[in-house]
Amino acid sequence: MKVSHIEHLGIAVKSLEEAIPYWENVLGLKCYAIEEVADQKVKTAFFKIGQTKIELLEPTSEDSTIAKYIENRGVGIHHMALACENIEEQLADAEAQGVRLNDKTPRKGAEGLTIAFLHPKSTQGILTELCEDKNK
């Protein structure tokens, strides 16, 4: 499997409205996009730090994965996303190496990226997202 860089860190928050001021006022970053990803039942806010982004994830439904994560673990880092090319190939390679896949088939994520998650039991306890920008 080949990845090029950390695309973003996903951080679970209860409220974007409450979380954004910390990133903007305390850290001096600018929120450049807010987007709802309906099929994942989340609303996201993005900040850029160098080549990497921070993605804040607010649940839009009590039965969303993020709402359940916050209920069980509290707010904080939810996942690490790694940029790659040929995501289908990367998933096949990961599976061939015994990595458990949350998503066997890539799907659409925020910012128009094609994404797939690897199970944390196979990735040293870190929920790992592969991201490909098919518009490049």
Give residue spans per PLM region:
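A short beta-turn/loop motif at secondary-structure boundaries
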Residues: V37-D39, N72, R107-A110
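Short, structured motif recognition centered on aromatic/hydrophobic residues
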Residues: I6, V13, W23, F47, ...
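Serine-centered coil/turn micro-motif
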Residues: D63-S64, G109
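N-terminal strand-loop-strand beta-hairpin
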Residues: G28-I49, K53, F117-H119
